[in-house]
Each structure stands twice: as structure tokens, then as C-alpha cells.
Amino acid sequence: MNKEDFSKRVLHAEDSLYRVAKSILHSDEDCADAIQNGILKAFQKLDTLRNDQYFKTWLTRIVINECYQIIRHAQRYVALEEYPGWGAEAVSEIEEESPVMSELMRLEENYRLPIVLHEIEGYSIREIGRILKLSETNVRNRIFRGKALLRKRLEGVI
């Protein structure tokens, strides 16, 4: 794969990468960092991609790893409550999007990420298994349990 093909494929996957990163990190700045670092690493390791058909899956896995790297190395854990009014505003902005998205973002990551990858990004169960390094059965179970939790949380809302 040459530089031009790489650039085209990255541009095609950009929105998807952002949504996946956002489901893990929540902060736009951290998402941008994770995506930028992931793309750089992918370009540097392009020779390790065995099959061009799996480029997007491979790149998504790299970005997810970068998200986890940012979480591990974050030195600043600040509670929203320490900034009066800011926390409430941030939560209300998310809730204005839709109650379903709001509750989805509140799910535990091990349920949220497979649902985002499958329902929003359109990845197959097999691809999600490769990305998250899980069996297909485990992916199906997490999606099923995550949706059950969502239904339960949304019973009185929708």
C-alpha cells in the first residue's frame, strides 16, 4: 500500500475512528490525540499489515490501543464537581443529543464499545472480535447484555 492509498483509507475511516475513540475517552482533545498517534503508528508499521482488506479493522485496533494508552498515562483526574456548573452543563449537552446515546455513553466500556462498533460503525461480529481480541461468542454476549442494560435504563424514558 502506498502513501496515497493509506491517506485515502485513513480519510475514509476518520469519522468511524472518532466515534470509537469518543466512546472510550469522551474528551475531544484526547480523542484527537489518540487518532493522530494511532494514524502515525499505523503509517510507521504499515509493513505489518498482512492483508489490505483488514486495514480499517487494523487501524481501529491501533486507535483503541492509543485510547487505552492515554487513559493509563493520564495524570489529571479532576472531578467535574470541582468546577461548579461545568459538570451539569456537560451532562446536559450529552443528554440533548438523545436519551439513547446518553445512556449508551454511561454503559461500562466492555458493553459500550462492542455496541458502538456493531450498531453505529457497522462492523461484523467477527471484525469486532478481531479488534477487541475476543471470541465471537463473547462479542455477541456483550452486545446482548449491553442492549439489555440499555433497555432497562430507558424503560421510563422512551
Question: What are the residue ranges of the model-derived segments?
Answer:
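A short, charge-rich alpha-helical start-of-domain segment used by transcription regulators
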Residues: 1-19, 23, 32-35
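Residue-level preference for hydrophobic side chains embedded in well-ordered alpha helices
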Residues: 9, 13, 17, 38, ...
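Conserved RNAP core-binding helix
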Residues: 18, 28-45
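Sigma70-family region 2
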Residues: 37-54, 73-74
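Arg/Lys-rich amphipathic alpha helix in sigma70-family domain 2
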Residues: 50, 61-81, 145
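DNA-recognition helix of helix-turn-helix
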Residues: 64, 132-156
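Internal acidic/polar
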Residues: 69, 76-104, 124
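A short pre-motif secondary-structure segment
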Residues: 114-118
